[in-house]
């Protein structure tokens, strides 16, 4: 039997981790696009 509060904590932590990971990847791609020298 799973403890509901444990499940909530785990899912919250997981979504925060995933959100942060996706956000950083997105941010890095944006910086890479903007940082290209146009010569």
UniProtKB/Swiss-Prot annotation:
GO terms of biological process kind: photosynthesis
Species lineage: Eukaryota, Viridiplantae, Streptophyta, Embryophyta, Tracheophyta
Record's function text: Not yet known.
Organism of derivation: Pisum sativum (Garden pea)
Protein family membership: Belongs to the PsaG/PsaK family.
Gene (UniProt): PSAG
Membrane topology (UniProt): Multi-pass membrane protein
Protein name: Photosystem I reaction center subunit V
Pfam families: PSI_PSAK (PF01241)
Location, primary (coarse class): plastid
